[in-house]
Amino acid sequence: MNLSVRRIAPGRAEGVALVARVPFSFVGGSDPMTGEVLDEASGVRGERLGRRAFAFPHGKGSTVGSYTIYGLAKRGLGPSAILMERADGIVAVGAVLAGIPMVDRVDLGALLTGDRLSVDADGGRVDLPDVDSRDVVTVFVRNRGRLLIVRRSEAVGSFQGKWSGISGYLEGREDPEDRARKEVSEETGIRDARLVAAGVPVISRDRGTAYVVRPFLFDVSTRRVRLDWENVESRWIRIDEIDAFDAVPRLEDVMRSALAGREVRKG
């Protein structure tokens, strides 16, 4: 799998991913003398930054963080590369001073700690040679402000028993909108669904597979659904109720992307 990213600090590097799911401060969050992660909230406390491709949403804290990054690199304890969802000045300055390749606009959902990866900041690319990607559509149908979610059957190939939107694989060069319409018809029996919006893709990992999820929002005139073999149960919910369900990874992110997506106009 490969990701298109934006260069912040130039260079190329390889390493094993170390992924923190929360904003990170190098000041207080790491030991400047050992490179050990100290921040409990990071989820990777006790790991060492040295020679790792360190990924996190964005930086926080003091401007001293720039010099902390530089100091780690001078001691040979710094990360081989830095990957972020959104770059900030503190980390960017530190990466430039330290000569560490840095990129942003990275969907961290594509990465797991332990992934082998290479970063080509100059080419705007991150490669994950051990990860396969699958393109899927996930559709949310809406009626009077509530969204349909379904519980996946034990007969499907992934995420059995989890709650999801209406989903299906894209094959070859199939048009995502066409597949979305087919999935709604096949999995709900609703024929008059009206396409409203298409969201920004969201990446969700399941071990060695990364699912590139393309979100869609349809409006429907009924809450009466006829499930096929892929799903065994359905609910109409508000988005703020999603935490009560054992859902597939990043379902709320996919739902929000669909709701905030670009409007699809007829013709």
Where are these regions (language model features)?
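A short coil-to-beta-strand element that immediately follows conserved catalytic motifs
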Residues: 190-200
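Feature captures the catalytic cores and cofactor-binding loops of soluble hydro-lyases/lyases
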Residues: 3-10, 17-125
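NUDIX/MutT-family hydrolases
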Residues: 217, 226-258
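Extreme N-terminal tail/first-helix region
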Residues: 1-15, 131-138
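Conserved Nudix-box catalytic region and its N-terminal flanking loop in Nudix hydrolases
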Residues: 146-186, 190
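Active-site-adjacent beta-strand/loop module that shapes the phosphate/pyrophosphate-binding cleft
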Residues: 143-145, 201-225, 235
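Conserved N-terminal beta-strand and adjoining loop/helix that marks the start
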Residues: 130-148, 167
